[in-house]
Amino acid sequence: MNDEGDLLQENTRDEGNETEASRMSKLRRTRKKVTKQHIFSTEVGEMDVSNSKERIRSQMVCHTLGNMSKPVVGPGSADSHLPQDDKDSENQTTVIKPSPLKTSASAPCSEFNTNSNHADNTWEDTQIPTTPHLSSRMKHIKQEMAKNHLQFVRFEATDLHGVSRSKSIPAHFFQEKVIHGVCMPRGYLELIPNPKDDEVDHIRATCFNSDIVLMPELSTFRVLPWAERTARVICDTFTVTGEPLLTSPRYIAKRQLSQLQDSGFSLLSAFIYDFCIFAVPEIINSKTISFPASTLLNNHDQPFIQELVDGLYHTGANVESFSSSTRPGQMEICFLPEFGISSADNAFTLRTGVKEVARKYNYIASFFIETGFCNSGILSHSLWDVDGKKNMFCSSSGIEELTITGKKWLAGLLKHSAALSCLMAPAVSCRKRYSKESKDLKESVPTTWGYNDNSCAFNIKCHGEKGTRIENKLGSATANPYLVLAATVAAGLDGLQSSDGVLASPGDSTDLYPSKPSEIPLKLEDALVALEEDQCLRQALGETFIRYFVAMKKYDLENEETDAERNKFLEYFI
């Protein structure tokens, strides 16, 4: 690993005069340069970072500002004792790289063997310099808290399943916790399958008993209309030494978006979710016949739908449309596209919000798939220039066709579809839909794509006011939205960097050439193998995360039968 603080990303792109060809050429260059300066850049200026305490202070200030397009990433990791074949550090494209405060190199896991006093001391001694941007944001938040007579603020973070894990803080302690963070046991988010499991020996079992720190991104502060006198703020997770948690799905997504930005692009995306509304003890509208988008079903319980949509709007998650879906009690909700991490934040907000609103009406809202049909989780996305002014998928010819950039992006998605399916359909039950049209017993099915074809895994839409976009339909609603976003960007970027794999024109074969046709494994076990063997995704998402994810899923498979009773209750949480 390089010396602390010695790595900074240099942004050398000329945003105004890039052609598509120059973008392709640029993507093949080395995207990391080494400098010898200890400079910490923020939107309010630069400061010299000269010691460990200053570096932690700098990291916390930039993070608190809530700059979602430029995530805070440290050069080290929570697992710095690992052999340095871990690609996390080698492939980070970051704006800020404050050096972590390290413990003795002779104690590989010593940074985890901490108690709450250690955690408090680490952050307590750090005084946050006040910036105009931070002061303005805090002033606005204080006004909101007073206006709404808030009593509590939830500090929320996502676990591997996309489930919100949080601690509620009395409102009068909010500013203090913004500065010092909120401690939470690491095992709450990483969900260790078994403390004695040798497959996760890259993270020692004792590490799961240590604290991590939830640091709020203030731009995500929202009053929750469905929770009495309560607000929430989405947090990023750090070790007590100020290093990002490498298994954090939101951190992984922000890192991939940073890679995309450094390559001269931005992502406009939105999630489309199916979820089920249950009454007690049966499904609402539980008829054997299905009427998708039926007006009567759309308005079956108007107060519930109105409160949900209005509540999501006030949390910043703009619902574009909703309707009944293909199964009894199943609803579809579509979000308005947004740039950056916001689309995943909106999906994360929905996953908790819909359950809280449903509970007020004595319903259960669930994304979990157990009854034999699928709740889908589609990521509709398009690639834009870094300024968000030009759709890089949209052909100027006026015909239904992707640009070369779009074709390369799609080629990357197809190339990595087997590994992508592992992250996007992470349970046995949600992989059944891959073979629903096939009567033959197969190990895999071809990955399909097409124009305006909703039966394909990747559906290209060129119509409508949104412009050309690709719907990634591999996902189920149980997948973590941050991982879906991160993996899609990683695969697409690899397609842009590749010199082959250009798609045929619409009139020719829909296969890739010269690459071999891609396949989606039907069994989760085979998908896990594909993920382990996919060097691109291993490098992009990080060795630490991949090894942990695979270990946890293997544990789930081994205990699938014994967990059947436990799974009956997952609909309350997933």
UniProtKB/Swiss-Prot annotation:
Record region (Disordered): 1-36, 66-131
Q: Which organism is it from?
A: Canis lupus familiaris (Dog)
Q: Where is the composition biased (Basic residues)?
A: 25-36
Ranges of residues in domain GS beta-grasp: 148-242
Q: Record's Gene Ontology CC terms?
A: cytoplasm; membrane
Task: Supply one GO molecular-function term.
Answer: catalytic activity
What name goes with this protein? Lengsin
Enumerate composition-biased segments (Basic and acidic residues).
Answer: 11-23
Name of the gene this protein is made from: LGSN
Give the transmembrane ranges: none
Please indicate which superkingdom the organism of origin belongs to. Eukaryota
Sequence ranges of Polar residues compositional bias: 91-131
Q: Check the record and name the InterPro entries matching this protein.
A: Gln_synt_N (IPR008147), Gln_synt_N_sf (IPR036651), Gln_synth/guanido_kin_cat_dom (IPR014746), Gln_synth_cat_dom (IPR008146)
Q: Locate the GS catalytic domain: which residues? A: 249-574
Q: How does it assemble?
A: Dodecamer. Interacts with BFSP2 and VIM.
